[in-house]
Amino acid sequence: MSEDLDERSLRYHASEPRGKLAVTVTKPMATQSDLSLAYSPGVAAPCLAIARDASKASLYTARGNLIAVITNGTAVLGLGAIGALASKPVMEGKAALFKKFADIDVFDIEIEERDPQRFCDIVAGLEATFGGINLEDIKAPECFHIERTLRERLSIPVFHDDQHGTAIVCAAAVVSGLKVVGKTLAESRLVTSGAGAAALACLDLLVSMGLPKKNITVSDKVGVVYAGRTEEMDEYKARYARDTEARTLSDMIEGADIFLGLSAPNVLRPQDCTKMADKPLILALANPTPEIMPEDVKAVRPDAIVCTGRSDYPNQVNNVLCFPFIFRGALDVGATAINEEMKMACVHALSAIAESEPSDVVKRAYADQMLSFGPEYLLPKPFDPRLITEVSAAVARAAMESGVATRPIEDFRAYRRRLSRYVYRSSAVMEPIFERAREQPRRVVYGEGEDDRTLQAAQQIVDTGIAVPILIGREAIIAARAKELSLRMRVGENIQVVDPQTAPRLAAYSDRYYQLMARHGVSPGRAEQVVRSSRTVYAALMLREGDVDAMLCGTVGPFRQHLRRVREIIGKAEGVRDLSTLVGLILPHGTYFVCDTHITLDPSAEELAEMAVLSVDEVRRFGIEPKVALLSHSNFGTYNNPHSRKVRKAVRMLRGRYPELQIDGEMHGEAAISERIRKLRFPDARLRDNANLLVMPNMDAAHISYTLLKQIGGGVSVGPILLGAAAPIHILTESSTVRGIVNMTAYTVVQAQIREAAS
């Protein structure tokens, strides 16, 4: 790990609040009445109810959505036996992933106990607190005994993710890979490099799914695990000892269909790959350097399918595809265990997601990636929104069918709808955008290159690799401010600076601006003056002339001033009536989009309809299916005046032209975001679930609502997103944060990619 990364990580963890987790109160605590319910005397009622019926704990407490991530720190990532306390940052990180991907609450518990039996006694005493236990970073072979003992003693799920999470995702890759090459598990021969906890769990799961044990040959750092071997053997490894003359990996790989590597870098040689069967499946999962690099495999076996543990190659085997969702399904049915049936359901659900045709939502979220089932797409993307709905539901159903569910689900359609809401509760909504931006970064010019926020954002953009920043400003000022801010980026190395006063393209841009504005009272001399002095103008001309791919401006100066320049130089896309804006708000309880917050003071019905349609396309870029509500002081006809009639007309227009859209109005704000309230007032509303795209009747309503929600709700904003422009350009605001600039950079890069692909 580089010193620079070390320092950044230490600052990240030390920033207030310390660490990565916090506990929040979920019930009102504002009045004496609230306190009397939360604690004494009112709390006695749920206590007595649970005493009478233990299953009520999931109804009256957080236990049903609470798991423990537990370790003794004996096998921490690549750090080894660093101890319980030193492992805490890793356990907090694991807890954060559970919360981020599946909205599961977690306590991380680090136990300084290396005796397996005493460790089990301590953990068993925690059963009353948790709905499930995720064992983490416990060394083999003790981890096998610990998990088996706890599974026998406890009536809640116990899951060692290092074993079974890896096994599930590996098995899904194998199932998908064999489908692609037309082979079956029953007829395949598999060799492994590595015989630790994860490798043995992979083998156990594949055997339970139909891989004959006689078709498996295992090797470790000593060599082949053969019948009669005594060196570094244990009862778990001995189950896969074979009567064979092979003693090395090279000996045993002849004719193998599958290579499973969970061992060390570079143990598989290219010449070994040439000995494998036709169309071999190679899972080289050592991290960060695999057993063999994919390009080395392809050089000698172009017919091979390769999986790694790395995100920079196709087919990443990543446990995050599994552990949040298998626990989500297990908790939701009150499972007493995570059994083989549930694990196999998870395997097949993952493979089915990859094999199925992605929805429009997924295609937009991962646009221009190869999402067609095949050699380079065996597993879903980690941020595929279908993971939580498909995997969790499959696991829940398997728990019910195998008899370990204590709270069976009656309506799976309603359950899937509830699961889909978890996707939109955090900044995870931005991750598909960032992932795509990183794959094909574009040149983004920033009009306010000297602004501190722009400079700090540029550093993050360089670090994340989502764009090539080009800053408009004076090089000396930018370099000095970057130094003052302790930024590591350097002009000419990882950022570019363009000073309009001295830029070689000044004359050409001035002439171009004159051509655009000659009929608007701008002389050649005035054109040069404007281009030289207005950084927004210069940046917009760079975009128009194709010298950059996208543009952001607006952090300094009035929005309208920037808008005027954008209208002059970039203009509207073909067929668009007028520009408008959309703002996204990522709040703790959901993600919402509001329009038009910045441009059209009092839009007509036609303008409302247009901005709604343009907004729908943008919302889908985030992997979110838009549910549109047009808001008003009138609630489904309670008022009949010009304002309500305008909104009503826009709804009719949209329904006529886009009958497939989930859209309704005119309605109150509370009816839009609460299906319960909406049904009370108007049971026949076409809108299902809660609206996430709120079209306001005028700019006053939109801007006030957005700014209040942002401040009071503590949300992260994305935008303003400029709708209807002829190029990827967006105007930020003077209140934009560094994070907001970074978010909009990623979004603008994706827009540039899409426009380029369409041209």
Residue ranges: model-predicted function:
Residues L85, D137-T184, T406-I409, R416-S759:
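Anion-binding alpha/beta catalytic cores of soluble intermediary-metabolism enzymes, centered on
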